[in-house]
Amino acid sequence: QQLLDLVDAILATPTETVKQRSGAAVVFRAKRYIHQHLGDQQLDSAAVAAAAHVSVKHLQRLFRAEDSGVMRYVWQVRLQHAHRLLSESNGQAASVQEIAWRCGFATAAHFSRAFRACYAMSPSHVQVPRLR
């Protein structure tokens, strides 16, 4: 009887652990989608929520629980990716404009402002010079 009571209690209400796991799975799907679509200038909370199969409001709540926001995370990942591209040392460095587009920025000016705000230096300061 005790075993049946225990099973009944478990099935009656989802545990906090299950809720946490399902929330973590949603955030994982959302982050994976963001990483796969960084270059998409139309990437926004609605697109990410649709890809994660949740509402925008629910997705925003899950990201806030991680002390972030959906779009804040998108910008952070875009800027980190841009920094990595700028600092590659293969001698075939792309232009700042090209890197801005690859990372989902509409203009090089917008990218430069965001980059400077994040890293306190211009993108061209980080960029490895091209080989001639």
Name the predicted role of every residue range.
Residues F63-H81, L85-L86, A114-R132:
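Alpha-helical DNA-contacting segments of helix-turn-helix folds
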Residues T15, K19-A30, W75-R78:
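N-terminal positioning helix adjacent to the helix-turn-helix/winged-helix DNA-binding module
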Residues V26-M71, G91-A106:
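DNA-binding recognition helix and immediately preceding turn/loop
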Residues I10, Y33-H37, L85:
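Short amphipathic alpha-helical elements of helix-turn-helix/winged-helix folds
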Residues S89-P129:
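Sequence-specific DNA-binding recognition helix
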Residues Q1-V18:
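An amphipathic alpha-helical interaction segment
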